[in-house]
A protein has these predicted regions:
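Aromatic-Pro/Gly-enriched surface loop or interdomain linker
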Residues: 1-59, 219, 223
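A glycine-rich, often tryptophan-bearing local segment used as a flexible ligand/cofactor-contacting loop or short
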Residues: 69, 74-150
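Solvent-exposed loop/turn segments at secondary-structure junctions
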Residues: 5-8, 67-71, 103-107, 195-198
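Alpha-helical scaffolding within the catalytic cores
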Residues: 47-53, 82-85, 174-178
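Non-catalytic C-terminal accessory domains or segments of carbohydrate-active enzymes
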Residues: 1-4, 97-99, 108, 195, ...
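Catalytic beta-strand/loop cores that center a nucleophilic Ser/Cys/Thr
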Residues: 124-188, 193-203, 216-223
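Structural motif
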Residues: 60-70, 98, 189-191
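The substrate-binding groove and active-site-proximal loops of carbohydrate-active enzymes
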Residues: 12-23, 40, 64-80, 195-196
């Protein structure tokens, strides 16, 4: 889910013939991993969401990847109640969502991550410094991390991400959340701060998608 949809399918994190960029590689790895994963992938724009109330029918998991206030994650598109309601409703009714970087990032109505309540994490931008933040315990035994043989490589990662009270943190470093999971209604959300391409990270994304879709039992179908 981004501002381009099909217009930049498979190229939405590519810069100048996919040359390495420090600002980009932590997100490009998601596209790289998806390209070899056993999933059907559709590229959906925010205009698609507005134009067709059924555009998410048949979708199991949404993925929103990139820095806040960019076309990658949507920026001001999240001010549209129809967009926010469509995505929240999709997850609440049983869909999955994987957010990487600053998904739905846009300062508006007291939140930076507009899907904070869905993802279970928020970014500290100075407005919530006085909020108590007691949730820092890690849960490394989660399904998503079972293939990892070493600490997860988040690339550049993200600064200032904290978990809401009912969120399960998988990885935090120096009290900055790098990976977390959260239930929202009947649905599931996964937050990852960055995902440069590697074999292990491709497994992390694979497992994140299966878990968020309530489909862990399919893990060994294409092992």
């Amino acid at each position: 889910l981004n501002c381009w949809g099909k217009m930049r399918a498979w190229g939405c994190h590519m810069v100048h013939h996919a040359l390495y960029q420090k600002q980009n590689y932590s997100y490009a790895g998601v596209i790289e991993a998806l390209s070899g994963a056993p999933f059907d992938v559709r590229f959906i724009s925010f205009d698609d969401l507005r134009a067709d109330a059924h555009v998410l029918d048949g979708v199991d998991v949404l993925i929103n990847v990139g820095d806040g206030d960019t076309a990658h994650t949507g920026g001001g598109e999240w001010e549209d109640p129809a967009v926010a309601a469509a995505v929240r409703g999709f997850v609440y009714n049983g869909g999955g969502i994987v957010g990487v970087g600053e998904p739905s990032g846009h300062q508006y109505e007291g939140h930076y991550l507009q899907l904070a309540g869905v993802l279970g994490v928020e970014k500290e931008t100075g407005f919530t410094l006085g909020y108590d933040k007691y949730n820092w315990d890690e849960h490394p035994g989660h399904f998503i991390l079972e293939d990892c043989t070493k600490p997860v490589d988040f690339g550049e990662g993200k600064k200032g991400i904290y978990a809401l009270p009912d969120t399960e943190i998988l990885v935090q470093r120096e009290k900055e959340v790098q990976m977390a999971v959260h239930a929202f209604g009947k649905g599931r959300a996964v937050y990852i701060s960055g995902l440069p391409y590697s074999f292990e990270n491709s497994r992390v994304l694979y497992r994140s998608i299966l878990w968020s879709a309530h489909d862990e039992e399919s893990l060994h179908k294409w092992f």
